[in-house]
């Protein structure tokens, strides 16, 4: 098969979406398929929308280009839309609308978590067929090789990492942990590292902050800690918790967004800054049992890409039937609006 992916992978710390594209391109190539990042060829079998926003620097084509491609060059291609973003993630009011408009061109929709699929916007607009394929991290990089569990006597070392610097990434929780570290009861029992970007001029008191890392350097840093914390609000299905967990670190995670479906059984949930201290106490109490479970953590890149390849193969096999269900012009005005860059 020839698969056109509308996002080009970048080297370096670029966030979870970039890691997804990198892993999928690698898996497709190893399976003997050809990956392109444009719509120049007339024999594309599958078109994958990763991000419909043409203003993003790594996006190579958008819904308007796909519409023209299907209409004038190759109506046989099947369009798959991967959805890993939402208004709720950053308390915005325009992402969902862009995704819904882009989704009109899609034959198939894939969400990165059940929480995403169940959002009100998709309960109103979602069409069959749709699937959920969870994100996964690369175990060749993120693994337990260098992990040393907490012994219970030394300070417990927490870590988190984020490419994006929006406050809803959990800064309220990390600030609360910083205040905890400043109290006598925790001063010699707890340390924390934040890897990644922060809003301009912001610092996290009591917390070690280092610049974004990628690949082996990131995995090495994560594995030098004892537990992973994520305070992300309405997380649509990030990869950061996967990378920490696959390095062997039990998870202290916010009960929000997709995090519970990724983290349940492999850590301790909390609601926010007011109860993160209690959650940390439970994690410390149950640490040995949680560490023993971490080798069973399921969300790997191998699992994720296997599910994607299986889906592509089924779609390619059923492409004639899928084409008969397609109606690109069922909403003429919205179809014309697609010709304007998102």
Predicted regions and their residues:
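Extended catalytic core of nucleotide-activated donor transferases of GT-like folds
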Residues: 36, 40-105, 115
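Acidic anion/phosphate-binding donor-loop and adjacent secondary structure
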Residues: 92-93, 136-154
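A short, active-site helix/loop in glycosyltransferases that binds the activated sugar's phosphate group
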Residues: 93, 104-130, 137-141
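Conserved donor-binding/catalytic core segment of Leloir-type glycosyltransferases
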Residues: 148-169, 175-179
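Aromatic "clamp/platform" in nucleotide-sugar-dependent glycosyltransferases that forms part
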Residues: 233
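Short hydrophobic beta-strand element within catalytic cores of glycosyltransferases
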Residues: 250-253
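A charged, aromatic-enriched C-terminal amphipathic alpha-helix characteristic of glycosyltransferases
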Residues: 285-338
